[in-house]
Regions:
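Short, highly charged, low-complexity non-transmembrane loops/tails of multi-pass membrane proteins
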Residues: 183-215
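Small-residue-rich segments of transmembrane alpha-helices in multi-pass membrane proteins
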Residues: 77-89, 133-147, 195-198
Length: 243
């Protein structure tokens, strides 16, 4: 694998880990209509472009729905690295068997790394108690992939450097976000437990007040009962004696 192919291999691998179908579609369009020499002819075929466009449209929707996006990412844990490795091998088509194998390894590893960052970031967004927009995050990812692949057409090394920076930044961001999510969840649990304890204490206080009031009523009612209806035993005895 020549040095001139390395930026293409790494960039396409990184982008495939974020949105593999967009990469296949963009490279095919650039090769077919932009006459980019580095793009393999197999990616320019109509059936490949049509299939990539259909899958890209499906991912465009699924990737913007909370929790559906995480399920989609789980399914593509294998798919994206495989596509990244396949694209890298196609890009290194004239490099021989060893060169293709090395390119596939680099592309697959880059795709797996960026996919892990994407999946971790999205899972952090979905489980965070703080409001966050999946649509905004997904749209940002799509635009970033399109921008980096477009830059690779004119400045491959600059695009590869940008992809490396984005990968490192993504890893750091996932770590920070997960720490914030864990802290926010602990605070939320603490507030929930505090409200539960306060409610339980209030219920016990109310029941204690009811018991005290009931005891007081029992202490006064017997005397009142004797006064009502002339039921005093002493009065009855006096009336019997006088008779």
């Amino acid at each position: 694998m020549g040095a001139e192919l390395l930026p293409w291999v790494f960039t396409s691998g990184w982008a495939s880990g974020v949105n593999a179908y967009a990469v296949v579609l963009l490279l095919g369009l650039f090769g077919r209509f932009g006459h980019v020499a580095e793009v393999p002819a197999s990616l320019e075929r109509t059936d490949v472009l049509a299939a990539a466009a259909i899958m890209f449209a499906i991912e465009l929707v699924a990737d913007k729905i909370p929790y559906v996006d995480s399920a989609w990412d789980s399914i593509h844990t294998v798919v994206r690295p495989v596509i990244g490795a396949a694209l890298a091998a196609l890009l290194a088509g004239d490099a021989g068997t060893l060169g293709q194998a090395l390119a596939a390894g680099v592309g697959g590893a880059a795709a797996l790394a960026s996919h892990s960052v994407k999946a971790g970031l999205r899972l952090a967004v979905n489980t965070s108690p703080e409001p966050a927009s999946n649509v905004a995050v997904s749209a940002g990812e799509d635009l970033t992939v399109a921008g980096v692949i477009s830059l690779a057409v004119v400045q491959p090394w600059l695009a590869a450097a940008l992809a490396a920076v984005l990968l490192a930044t993504g890893i750091a961001l996932v770590v920070v976000l997960w720490r914030r999510v864990q802290l926010a969840r602990r605070r939320w649990r603490a507030r929930r437990d505090g409200r539960a304890r306060a409610s339980a204490n209030g219920g016990r206080a109310a029941r204690s007040g009811a018991w005290v009031g009931s005891d007081r009523n029992h202490a006064t009612n017997p005397a009142e009962g004797r006064d009502v209806g002339g039921s005093d035993p002493a009065g009855s005895d006096r009336r019997a004696s006088s008779a």
